[in-house]
């Protein structure tokens, strides 16, 4: 019987179309199994189970806890005590008052609070901790959850003054930490630990900072004017509105207007897979929960229309569903941002495994609460999300971040299930040479950057090695962004009068070669054309262009590579002498936040004397 079935199956497979046999799951066609399950059910049935596991593990193993071979309390995670307090606090707050297990949970929580009170806990950790204490107080659980001696220590420790001077200056921190300080001051007031005077000053500081660094377009520069705009720049206004709400204040109409701009971007990058931002740092699950934060607070504040709320909620449910299926690994009892060919930012390394679990679950729980309060508790998500996005989101949109000496903007191109994000900014100090900050058409499964990888393999940017050994890429000094439409083809062009000289922590202008770049985006195809014009005669040692692709089974003919598997079907280059392709074989240099690239295509030209403009073009065709 078995052999008959096997033979029958073999015959069926032999005559089946290839697509039926090998129905590839790529990032663009991935759909989470719980895609149409209400967000509240996903959270209740999964997130709390994960928190219960961590609670029991902490009670048993205490500060000696081991997670997938790492020791979280020996990792130097400066936020961990606050994240532990918040994560386990969710369990207490979700346990009914008449539940017989509540008393033991409160006792265990008290012991863990006693254990962590002597540990380092900074800024965000303070914010997480005091926010939980306020909720426990409001629920009437505080006295049973935290001992008087520990609460007195926390009253002294959980203080914005630990990172703000008496002159109201931040102590060696980016200016967006004024928002953290403001929240802590307001939460201390709600605890009865201080009056509202400091909160008022810090609120003014926070809003002044936001206005200074967001200019007239409303998105916050992550640097002191260098022009780094990324997921944080878009998320920050939502965080500010959340801080108002959690401390009993109503956001102003001006803040709601800025939030609407962020919501527009969030809707424009929404998709059926629950995938998040594709550019900048701190992606993976954080790129996804960021969108849910923006959309949930926008829904709660009625910044979205009733119809937009329905589909923003449908997308948010898919993000939660994706977290449980894609990011969470039941065998590890943890999310996994570090295995399976995935690579994340150094500061989110595996040593922070426990804190990362707690902070992401906290974000899912908090945004779920916001959706519940907005009227969506246990609501069945709309199933026709793709059709709605196709109909209501512009196929092409441009959001300006800054204008002046340099232009900074985000172009979004929607092509069916693919969402292409071309972020034209300057990564600035510490990020300018990292590919997630390059002006590339990022799209999951098609083009991705590699976190903290530097420019050793400058993804899809021609790299000039000059005769003096210096290396240049066109990454930072973008001017004169222009867009045009020709039928269903969209064109974006810009110029750079200086290239980015590599090797320093900050970008350095190098005026030996000028660059004019044109992108053409159309259905199934993206083309970049670069015209490099030397200032005088320039001696070049080598030009190289690398593309790390998620597609594999590559065949190369001349300077065209075709792929048998993956979303990218063809990659072709002109203007360089030769190309070669090779499998990446799991090399860490070629890993995106959500998985490994499979093939590296390298094109290059040897020594040349550059007197005339040189055109280099690449085209990616995808399905």
Each PLM stretch: what is its role?
Residues 70-74, 112-119, 161-171:
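Helix-loop junctions that connect tandem helical modules in alpha-solenoid scaffolds
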Residues 56-61, 104-112, 152-165:
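Trp- and S/T/G-rich repeat-edge/linker motifs of beta-rich repeat architectures
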Residues 606-622:
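Short Pro-Gly-centered flexible turn/kink motifs
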Residues 152-392:
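Extracellular polysaccharide-recognition and catalytic grooves
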């Amino acid at each position: 019987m078995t052999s008959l079935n096997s033979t029958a199956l073999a015959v069926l497979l032999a005559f089946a179309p290839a697509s039926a046999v090998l129905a590839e799951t790529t990032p663009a066609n991935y759909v989470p199994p719980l895609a149409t399950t209400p967000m509240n059910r996903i959270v209740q049935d999964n997130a709390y189970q994960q928190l219960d596991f961590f609670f029991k593990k902490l009670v048993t193993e205490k500060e000696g806890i081991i997670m997938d071979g790492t020791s979280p309390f020996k990792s130097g995670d400066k936020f961990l005590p606050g994240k532990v307090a918040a994560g386990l606090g969710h369990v207490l707050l979700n346990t009914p008052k008449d539940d017989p297990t509540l008393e033991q949970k409160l006792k265990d929580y008290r012991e863990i609070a006693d254990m962590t009170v002597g540990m380092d806990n900074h800024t965000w950790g303070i914010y997480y901790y005091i926010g939980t204490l306020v909720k426990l107080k409001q629920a009437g659980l505080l006295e049973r959850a935290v001992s008087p001696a520990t609460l007195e220590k926390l009253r002294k420790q959980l203080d914005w003054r630990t990172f703000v001077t008496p002159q109201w200056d931040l102590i060696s921190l980016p200016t967006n930490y004024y928002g953290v300080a403001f929240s802590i001051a307001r939460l201390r007031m709600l605890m009865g630990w201080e009056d509202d005077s400091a909160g008022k000053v810090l609120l003014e500081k926070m809003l002044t900072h936001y206005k200074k660094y967001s200019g007239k377009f409303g998105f916050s520069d992550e640097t002191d004017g260098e022009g780094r705009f990324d997921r944080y720049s878009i998320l920050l206004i939502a965080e500010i509105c959340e801080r108002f709400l959690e401390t009993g204040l109503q956001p102003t109409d001006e803040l709601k207007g800025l939030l609407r701009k962020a919501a527009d971007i969030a809707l424009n990058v929404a998709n059926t897979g629950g995938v998040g931002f594709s550019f900048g740092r701190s992606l993976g699950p954080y790129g996804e929960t960021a969108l849910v934060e923006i959309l949930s607070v926008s829904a709660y504040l009625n910044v979205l229309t009733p119809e937009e709320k329905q589909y923003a909620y449908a997308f948010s449910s898919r993000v939660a569903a994706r977290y449980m299926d894609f990011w969470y690994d039941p065998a590890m009892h943890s999310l996994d941002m570090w295995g399976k060919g995935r690579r994340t930012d150094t500061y989110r390394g595996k040593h922070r495994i426990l804190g990362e679990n707690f902070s992401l679950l906290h974000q899912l729980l908090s945004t779920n609460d916001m959706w519940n309060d907005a009227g969506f508790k246990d609501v069945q998500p709309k199933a026709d999300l793709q059709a709605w996005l196709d109909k209501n989101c512009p196929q092409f949109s441009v959001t300006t971040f800054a204008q002046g000496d340099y232009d900074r903007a985000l172009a979004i191109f929607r092509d069916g299930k693919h969402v292409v994000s071309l972020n034209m900014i300057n990564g600035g100090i510490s990020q300018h040479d990292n590919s997630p900050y390059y002006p590339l058409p990022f799209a999951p499964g098609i083009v991705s950057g590699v976190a903290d990888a530097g420019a050793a393999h400058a993804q899809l940017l021609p790299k000039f090695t000059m005769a003096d050994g210096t290396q240049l890429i066109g990454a930072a000094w973008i001017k004169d962004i222009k867009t045009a439409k020709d039928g269903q083809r969209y064109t974006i062009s810009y110029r750079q009068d200086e290239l980015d000289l590599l090797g320093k922590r900050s970008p350095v202008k190098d005026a030996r070669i000028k660059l004019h770049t044109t992108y053409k985006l159309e259905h199934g195809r993206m083309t970049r054309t670069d015209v490099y014009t030397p200032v005088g005669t320039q001696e070049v040692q080598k030009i190289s262009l690398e593309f790390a692709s998620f597609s594999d089974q590559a065949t190369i003919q001349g300077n065209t590579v075709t792929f048998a598997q993956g979303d990218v079907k063809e990659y072709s280059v002109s203007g360089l002498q030769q190309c070669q392709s090779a499998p990446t074989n799991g090399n860490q240099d070629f890993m995106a936040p959500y998985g490994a690239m499979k093939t590296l295509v390298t094109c290059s030209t040897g020594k040349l004397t550059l007197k005339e403009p040189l055109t280099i073009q690449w085209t990616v065709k995808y399905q």
